[in-house]
């Protein structure tokens, strides 16, 4: 299973990358806006840190606009993956970019059928948003499980990125279901590394070590 970090904060990306667990990065316009920096500058710096897929999202809503933005974005670095919205125009753009050999990540997926349409259009990745589904009392991880089953049934190679991850349980369930990727906020990555019994064990070892004759 791959871990992407879901942020545009370069400091967070550097710190998580130093742990040796980050395989890629996902960004979106909201995350870029929080950085207060130019979009292209942020993406360039991220590609210098992480040698893996970097999802960068278009903001155009029409096919031609999406393609124009995508073709500019991929000039930044070969690892750029174009994030496209799950709309009919987004599907058209996915098909076009697939034909050009450009990788795509169809985002804002909230149903198995949306994921299937994206896979059929040639998406490299689909991103179901589990946290947002949970927020409206739907079963976010259940949707991921259904997508996994459908893709396996028909041999789709489109990878599933579990997005809108809110807690370590989302990551655990993603791994158990067989999702290809979980894209995780920095704070949740840090939570994954912690356990109170680990802290207690370290404390006990150090206390015992102090008793050893020096």
Swiss-Prot record:
MF GO annotations: aldehyde-lyase activity; transaldolase activity
PANTHER family, alphabetized: FRUCTOSE-6-PHOSPHATE ALDOLASE 1-RELATED, TRANSALDOLASE
Similarity comment text for this entry: Belongs to the transaldolase family. Type 3B subfamily.
Stored PROSITE patterns: TRANSALDOLASE_1, TRANSALDOLASE_2
Species of origin: Geotalea uraniireducens (strain Rf4) (Geobacter uraniireducens)
Subcellular location field: Cytoplasm
Record gene name: tal
SUPFAM superfamilies assigned to the protein according to its UniProt record, in alphabetical order: Aldolase (SSF51569)
Enzyme class: transferase
Pfam family, one: TAL_FSA
InterPro entries in the cross-refs: Aldolase_TIM (IPR013785), TAL/FSA (IPR001585), Transaldolase_3B (IPR022999), Transaldolase_3B/F6P_aldolase (IPR004731), Transaldolase_AS (IPR018225), TSA/FSA_arc/bac (IPR033919)
Active site per the UniProt annotation: 83 (schiff-base intermediate with substrate)
Transferase found in the keyword field: yes
GO biological process: carbohydrate metabolic process; pentose-phosphate shunt
Pathway assigned to this chain's UniProt record: Carbohydrate degradation; pentose phosphate pathway; D-glyceraldehyde 3-phosphate and beta-D-fructose 6-phosphate from D-ribose 5-phosphate and D-xylulose 5-phosphate (non-oxidative stage): step 2/3
EC number: 2.2.1.2
Protein role: Transaldolase is important for the balance of metabolites in the pentose-phosphate pathway.
Keyword presence, Ion transport: no
Gene3D superfamilies: Aldolase class I
Keywords: Cytoplasm, Pentose shunt, Schiff base, Transferase
Gene Ontology cellular component annotations, sorted alphabetically: cytoplasm
Protein name: Probable transaldolase
